[in-house]
Design a protein with these regions (language model features):
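A short, well-structured juxtamembrane/interface segment
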Residues: 1-16
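Short, conserved clusters of charged catalytic residues that mark active-site
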Residues: 3, 79, 112-116
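A cross-family acyltransferase "interaction/gating" segment
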Residues: 11, 58, 93, 107-171
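Catalytic core of membrane glycerolipid acyltransferases/transacylases, capturing the structured
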Residues: 13-74
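Residue-level preference for the first positions of well-ordered beta-strands
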Residues: 16-18, 93-97
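Helix-adjacent hinge/juxtasegments
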Residues: 68-82, 88-89
Length: 172
C-alpha cells in the first residue's frame, strides 16, 4: 500500500516523542512505522498485544525490533510503560494506539483511549503528537486477514499539532 504522509514536518528530527494513533486495521502499525522510519529515519517502538509476540516469525521480528509487549491482564501491566519510559529517556520514539485494540465502530470512530501515552509524556517531559490514519480499511477489512483488491490504494497518515500538556505539567 502507499502511505501518504501529511504534517510530517511537525515531528522533531531529534529527541524523544510519543505518537498516539487511531487503530482501524492490522496495517496501521506498518503505516506509522513507514512514516517514522522511511520518512524520518527513526525506528518507532510500538506497544503491541502480547499475543503477537507468540506468533512464529512475527514474534521474533517484533522482539528484534525492540517492540514492547502489552499484557492485557495480570501482574505485569506496568512493565510495558516502564519499557516505554526507558526508550523515551534514551531519546527514542514511542507509538501507542491508546484505544488498546482495533476500533469496534463500523463507522471507524475512535473509542475511549487509555491514559498511558499521556502519563508517559508527563513523566518524561516529551511531546505527544496525534496521528489520524484512514484508507487501510479499503485494503484490509477491519477484522480481516485477506486483502481486498487494489492493494496499492493510499493510506493517509495525518500528523496533528503537538498536544498541549502545559496545564497538566504545572500540576506535577
Amino acid at each position: 500500500f502507499k502511505v501518504v504522509p501529511v504534517g510530517i514536518e511537525k515531528l522533531p528530527k531529534k529527541g524523544a516523542y510519543v505518537l498516539v494513533a487511531n487503530h482501524v486495521t492490522n496495517l496501521d502499525a506498518l503505516a506509522v512505522a513507514y512514516l517514522t522510519y522511511v520518512q524520518l529515519k527513526r525506528a518507532p517502538h510500538f506497544l503491541a498485544k502480547e499475543g503477537l509476540f507468540r506468533v512464529p516469525v512475527i514474534g521474533a521480528i517484533l522482539r528484534a525490533a525492540g517492540q514492547i509487549p502489552v499484557y492485557r491482564s495480570g501482574h505485569r501491566n506496568d512493565t510495558p510503560l516502564k519499557a516505554a519510559h526507558a526508550y523515551l529517556e534514551a531519546g527514542h520514539t514511542i507509538a501507542i494506539f491508546p484505544e488498546g485494540t482495533l476500533t469496534r465502530s463500523p463507522e471507524l470512530w475512535p473509542m475511549r483511549g487509555k491514559s498511558g501515552a499521556i502519563r508517559l509524556a508527563l513523566e518524561t517531559g516529551v511531546p505527544v503528537y496525534p496521528v489520524g490514519q484512514w484508507g487501510s480499511e479499503q485494503i484490509l477489512p477491519q477484522y480481516g486477514s485477506k486483502f481486498r483488491p487494489g492493494f496499492w490504494k493510499p493510506v493517509n497518515v495525518l500528523i496533528g499539532d503537538e498536544i498541549d500538556l502545559s496545564n497538566y505539567r504545572k500540576r506535577q
